[in-house]
């Protein structure tokens, strides 16, 4: 047993013995559950939702003719087998490609239409704008304006829809122009004083940090600063339990169904899907 699994097992045992049930964590599917389904496809969101999952993370890009599509990568090569850049092609052109399982590139409108009648949703819309050449400032601002309006118009009354990004430019613009929105700054680092200070400077109340390297003490400090802590990536039930033990408020997973099955053994954890 490696050290991570040992720690997780010990934490689970202690929590179970003590009957702790106060901690609530919101659990959501990364790209719809990218290691269990074809990521970011409509069929993936449908399949995951059918199993009881109402929390999702997804990625939004802009085609050359100004249409929003759902894709983590700028290039279709990994998922569609074609060396094609999304931002350089029209929606009509991009819709001709298929994944190995026959799925087409999903539009934001198609995803929002699927979500419109779902209850208790938590959805992160990641703004994929870090490439400054593809998204210079003027284009970035138009992207943000259009995305905010489209998402908020489609938001069910009881849903939590938030905008996330690694791109400081996008976060800063959105918080400045749309202060009533919900935002999360993503960073490929553990929770730290530096990240807490950056979140304050960006005027966001949520941070998305790496599980690896994050300590419970750091999460406690983030909470003291009024921040909501989301941790990633989640590749296993062990990662989920580690995130719980660290005190995370939100946990993202590539294997949501596997974790949901495992959670049945941990009734002392209050998990919202």
Positions of PLM-derived features:
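Phosphate-group recognition and catalysis centered on beta-loop-alpha active-site segments
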Residues: 21-273
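Bacterial Sec-dependent N-terminal signal peptides
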Residues: 1-24
């Amino acid at each position: 047993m490696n050290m991570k699994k040992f720690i997780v097992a010990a934490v689970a045992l202690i929590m179970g013995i003590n009957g702790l049930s106060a901690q609530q964590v919101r659990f959501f599917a990364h790209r719809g559950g990218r290691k269990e389904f074809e990521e970011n496809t409509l069929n993936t969101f449908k399949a995951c939702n059918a199993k009881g999952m109402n929390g999702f993370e997804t990625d939004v890009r802009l085609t050359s003719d100004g249409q929003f599509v759902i894709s983590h990568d700028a290039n279709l090569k990994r998922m569609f087998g074609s060396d094609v850049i999304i931002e350089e092609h029209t929606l009509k052109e991009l819709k001709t490609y298929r994944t190995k399982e026959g799925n087409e590139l999903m539009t934001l409108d198609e995803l929002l239409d699927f979500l419109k009648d779902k209850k208790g949703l938590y959805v992160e819309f990641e703004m994929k704008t870090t490439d400054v050449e593809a998204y210079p400032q003027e284009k970035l601002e138009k992207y943000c304006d259009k995305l905010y309006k489209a998402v908020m118009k489609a938001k069910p009354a009881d849903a939590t829809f938030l905008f996330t990004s690694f791109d400081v430019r996008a976060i800063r613009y959105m918080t400045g122009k749309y202060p009533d929105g919900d935002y999360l700054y993503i960073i490929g680092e553990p929770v730290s004083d530096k990240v807490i200070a950056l979140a304050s400077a960006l005027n966001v109340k949520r941070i998305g940090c790496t599980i690896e390297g994050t300590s419970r003490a750091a999460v406690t400090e983030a909470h003291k600063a009024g921040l909501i802590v989301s941790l990633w990536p989640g590749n296993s039930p062990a990662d989920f339990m580690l995130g719980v033990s660290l005190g995370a408020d939100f946990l993202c997973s590539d294997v949501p169904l596997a974790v949901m099955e495992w959670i049945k053994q941990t009734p002392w954890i209050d998990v919202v899907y």
